[in-house]
Structure formats: C-alpha cells, structure tokens
Amino acid sequence: MSEEPVDVLIIGAGASGAALAWSLAETRMNILCLEQGDWVKSDDYPSNATDWELRRLGDFGFSPNDRKLASDYPVNDSESPIAASMFNGVGGSTILFAAHFPRLHPSDFRVRALDRVASDWPLDYRSLAPWYDLNERMTGVSGLEGDPAYPQDPPKRPPLPPLPLGQLGETLARGFNKLGWHWW
C-alpha cells in the first residue's frame, strides 16, 4: 500500500463517492477512494447476462440480509418503510444498478399549468437537460435511441447500448411485438 499523502479521501465509491471522484479526476489532486468489499469484474455484473433476473435473487440481490456475502453486514429495516438496497464493493450499490435513469418529461415541470394539481417547478426541463446529459455520461446510462421516456431535442443516442433483456423481458417483448404494442 502506498504511503503517499492524498489531497482528497473519499469514503465509499458508490454513486455519490464515484461522482465526486469523477468530477475531481482531471485536477492535479491526489484522490483516494476507500471501499468496503472487493472489485466486481464488469463481466460478472448481473445486468450483462440474460439470466440477470435469477441472479438478482442470489449474490446480487438488493438486501445484504438475503445475500449474506462476506462483505455484507445485517441491516434491520423492519421498522422502516424503505427496504435496504445495498452492496459492499467498489461501486457500492451501483453494482446493482442497471443504468436506468429515466428523465422527467417536460410536462412534469408544469403540473399546475397543465393539470391544475400541485405546483409548477421553479425551473423547466431545458434548464435541467445539460445536467441530465452530464449524469448520463458519468454514470453510463444505456438505452435505445428514440425512447420516448428520454425526451431529448434533438434526439440523441444514449451513451451506452441497451442492456440485454432477461428471459422474462424477451418473452414480453415478443408478445408485445406480436400485438403491435410499443414495449420500450
């Protein structure tokens, strides 16, 4: 282990820690991320295989209470309305993340004006669009060009290609295609 001093120490290289490290990477600062758990090879990510739906029930399940890996510790969330979704390793819970970051639709910012409910946002979609773009580049969002869930003007291809559909997803896609329904 190096004993060289560091300028920035980041505890946890999950979504927040990795975003901070990414934003500082082009500086001349010496950055160190400490993480509980091991490296997971990208080839081992469950989202890279068609059996990912089954793998989510085992070593890549959301709850450390179910996984019980050596790096896991029990979490008591019985009194919480929020169930734990945690993973200990470089990347943290982003290891469980399938690069799905749906954008709000432009009309979501104008619910009062359009639907007479709640309040309109103090900003609009176009104000957030550059930040959506940055997040998608940084986190490696995948998808299909033209997906209406990701409104972009002009339309752009997501930074990464779509993840493979699981066996259930392929079955549903075939059924939707047979019916002429839009499935993505």
Give a label for each model feature.
Residues 1-113, 117, 122-126, 130-134:
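N-terminal glycine-rich phosphate/pyrophosphate-binding loop and immediately adjacent elements
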Residues 72-74, 100-103, 112-184:
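Conserved redox-cofactor binding core of oxidoreductases
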